[in-house]
Amino acid sequence: MRQKWWTLLFVICISLLLTACQGNRAATPLSPVEAANLAAEWATTELAVVNGGFYEEGEYETFLYKGMNYRYLASHIDSKKKLTAELRKTMTKKGAKRFMKDNGIISYKKRMAQPEAEFVSELMWNVATVKEVKAKKSKMVMELTVPIGETRTAEKMKFTYVYKKRHGWRIDKVEK
């Protein structure tokens, strides 16, 4: 009988210990490869968003707002909730807000919209080089050098990465 109590107590202690440790993910250092991959994923999202998303046939709508031509974003990112969710795959909440502001994205008649323009990128993210500028436990600044097409030139950008317990490493700021 006494053996059963000790076994039961042991099982309860182990399960409590495992439960307590589950949500406590410690920040692991961000490797240069992980930093480059996250930046490349962000760049893909950025290009899609600044081009309005992936429009379906007949979905593209424009309007005049404060003397400028605007377009509604595609249906998969046409609400603040959808757009934020898409950006939060690679960015922090603060970074996503900054991105929307910097790119002139507004809410108009309950839909997200932006100034009408088209963007093309020749940045070759698959061969980007990464240099660590500053590192703390849950914040890192990396400088990425990304070649531009076949021009033999490159663009340097500073990425600030922040570790969030719930989501892991995310981009907080991009300086071009």
Task: Name every feature range the model reports, one short phrase each.
Residues M1-L9:
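Bacterial N-terminal signal peptides that target proteins for export
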Residues L17-A20:
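C-terminal motif of bacterial Sec signal peptides marking the signal peptidase cleavage site
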Residues G67, S138, E150-R152, H167:
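Intrinsic-disorder/low-complexity loop/linker signature
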